[in-house]
Structure formats: C-alpha cells, structure tokens
Amino acid sequence: MQREHLGSRLGFLLLSAGCAIGIGNVWKFPWMTGQYGGGAFVLIYLLFLLVLGVPVLTMEFAMGRAAQKSPLKMYQQLKPGSKWGWHGYVCLLGNIVLMMFYTTVAGWMLQYFVDTAAGVFVGLDTAGIETKFGEMLANPAKMALYMGVVVVVGFSVISLGVQKGLERVTKWMMMALILLMWVLAFHSMTLSGGSRGLSFYLIPDFRRMAEIGVGNVVVGAMNQAFFTLSLGIGAMAIFGSYIGKDHALMGEAVRVSLLDTMVALCSGLIIFPACFAYGVDVNSGPALIFMTLPNVFNHIALGRFWGSLFFLFLTFAAFSTVLAVFENIVCCVSEMTGWSRKKTCLICCAGIFLLSLPCLLGYNLWQNVRPIAGHDILDSEDFLVSNLMLPLGSLIFILFCTTRYGWGWEKFMREANEGTGLKVAKWMRPYMTYVLPVIVFVIFVIGLVGFFKT
C-alpha cells in the first residue's frame, strides 16, 4: 500500500511545530526566562536550541524521510538485520507512556476552558480558586470525562487520514492558536502596569543571572532547549516519513524550532504583563495556570472573555501535541499488525483511555501510590519519558546517524541535504559525532540527579 503524504510544506511545519508546542511552553519557559535573567536566558536558550535541538531534530526527520516508515520499522528499513530495531519498540512505548499522563493534563485544559466560559470562577477570591482546583483533582469521574473527550476526538481526527484528518485539523488549529496568542499578548501588554512585567521578562538582567549562578542558568537553558522539541521517541521522525525531498532538512528543523520558540516567548508576553499589572506572584507549573491566572482574569475587564480565550489557547496547544503523538502510535501499531487505520484507531482509543486512568486516579483514589522515588503517578510517568526515554533515545538517534555501526554519517548527510535550503555542512561532523552525544549524556545525568534529589 502506497504511503500517504502531507499535502503541503506548511502542513509539515505546523504539524511538527504542533508536536513540539505544548503546555510546557506556557507554564515553564516564561517562568524560567523571568527567573534566570530575562533576555540573557533567551539568548543562551536560542544558542542551545541551534547547537543541540536542531541537529537531533534533523536526524529524526532524515531517518523518517529515508525509511518512509514509522519509528517502529525505520531501523529495519535503514539497517536491515541489525539490533537497532529494538529502539523502534521503545519509541512506541515512549509515545504511549507520554499519552498516559498528557491526555489527563489536556483534559484539565479543556475543563478549565469550559468552566471559565461558564463563569465558574467569577467572583471567587484566591482561596476559592484554589479550592476549585482541588475539587477538580478530587473528582475522578469528571476528569475521566474530559480526558475521554480528548482521547475520542483525537483518534477520530486521526482515523480520517493524514491529509483529510491530521493535516487539515492541525493547520486550522495551529493558525487559530497563533492568532489567539497574538490577540492575548496585545491585550496583556496594554494593561496598566504591564510594562514592568515586560521589563522583568525581556530585559537582560545579569545581576539576577549572577545571583542564581551562571552554571545553573546554562544548565536550565540547555535542558529547556532539549526537552521542548520532544526528541528521542520518534515523535518527529513520523512527519519526516510523510514529506517529499524538495527541501533540505536542517532548514526545516530550524523553522520548526523557531515556531516553537515564538509560542514560548509569546506566552510570556501574555503572562508577565498581566501578573505584574495586578501584583500577582509569578510561579511555575500547574499553580500558574490553574490558580494564579484565573485570579488575574477576575480582576481584568471582560476577564471571563479573556480567560476563556486563554484556556482555549492552552487547549489547542495541548491538543496539537496529542494529535501528533496519536498519529505516531497509530502508524506504528498499524505497521506492526497490518490493521486498517480505522480499526487501529478504535483499538488504540480504548487502550489509551484505559492506560490514562491511573494518572487521574493518582490525585484521589490512588493518591498514596508513589511508584518511583516517592513521586506520584503523573510525575513517575513523566520521569520515564522526560528523564529516560527522551535523552537516551536522542543518544541512540545520534549514534545511529553518525557511526559506521548504524546508518552512518554519509547516508545521513546525503538524505538530510537532499533538496533546497540550509544543509548539514561537512565541518559539523566532528561536533555531531563526538561533542553532541556528550552533551545529551550530561543532560541525562543532570535529569536523574535532579529527579531523585527531589
């Protein structure tokens, strides 16, 4: 059966960016930028994005395009008879584990969009808003409902095919996301007192950077640049398999990285002016999204409207990742079993829903279950993906593309450079072969130490 391809280059770029853009762009990147020295952190982050994220992303795209297979089968296609193929199964497992907790978080975004639009938070003080968040976590049935909507809608889109389902929906959703983002950012920057938030966010503050420690800032930027693109589990390789050979792949990797960075930066333009305008502390993680910002919207004129738009923006950001990863899972399972796309979607839909239940139950009925080092179920699942599968998977991609024991540098470079645009240069070989694996391994070790310390 002939492999279905994406209908346009724009579709490929938006799909790949949609996979990279997620809720971490909104609740982590702006906070890190503000705390780690503003514009100084952004410059260091962009440097690491270019020297770390772009090369590995180029490798994933090249492997997918050359093999014209899912991550499950691409190793067998590129290096027949080798043992590299086992990593394809790890990639599939990584995508599944990622969705075991990400669908729950996407469900939270959807629920907060519905609740904000319905006026649930209107008139509540800080304590009341915090109580609402606690009530959501304590209600497994309601969380399962919203998580189920995310799963069913996601697989329904994927069942329509690459062009008619995935590409069509993602293109419109990503364009809506970008429009919403700019509208929200413009409104936030016009708030009285918002300029102080912009100064805190964007102006380089080397004194603040020195207080935190230059080493800590560099490590933070390096980690964020690596993890923002979701490299290492083949989530990007699948899109390489859906495109032609008109464009060189390093240029495409740069464009996807810049799109991802634009959304991350603009999230800060939404959050910091609003928080500073109303004297609200800016913190990281779920507290920022589910407690701090609903409180801010209660003080803004037409806050219910702007809050609804913000949580719609977040829902789109989460759902774009869900669609991309669902496509990867469906393609892998379909190639492994020979099932039709619709049958695969139906079975995967039921499977992902059931596998996602432990995560949401970990906040109520199973709240005493602490699988890894005393961490709850969501954090434990996140650890398996973010701290193990992403860095180790990226290391495997690098070794496969640069050593004679794998696909090899010459074949990788020939595939990556086919077409017009920015190409992999010969002088990059020593860096990508010897330096890049060391950087990724350092990130892996830092992640392990940090997780078990906390």
Please annotate each region the language model reported.
Residues 87-90, 338-349, 380-440:
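C-terminal membrane-solvent junction of multi-pass transporters and transport-like membrane proteins
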Residues 1-27, 56-61, 65-78, 82-89, ...:
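Membrane-interface "cap" regions at the ends of multi-pass membrane proteins
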Residues 32-36, 83-99, 134-136, 149-173, ...:
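Membrane-water interface regions at transmembrane-helix termini and the short interhelical loops
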Residues 5-16, 41-44, 83-96, 145-150, ...:
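Select transmembrane alpha-helical segments in multipass membrane proteins
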Residues 3-4, 32-36, 71-90, 103-163, ...:
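Inter-helical loop and helix-membrane interface segments of multi-pass membrane transporters/permeases
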Residues 2-6, 167, 171-319, 323, ...:
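Membrane-embedded translocation segments of transport machinery
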Residues 3, 73, 106-138, 242-246, ...:
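Helix-loop-helix connectors at the membrane interface of multi-pass transporters/channels
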Residues 11-48, 234-240, 251-254, 258-259, ...:
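Transmembrane helix-boundary motif of multi-pass solute transporters/channels
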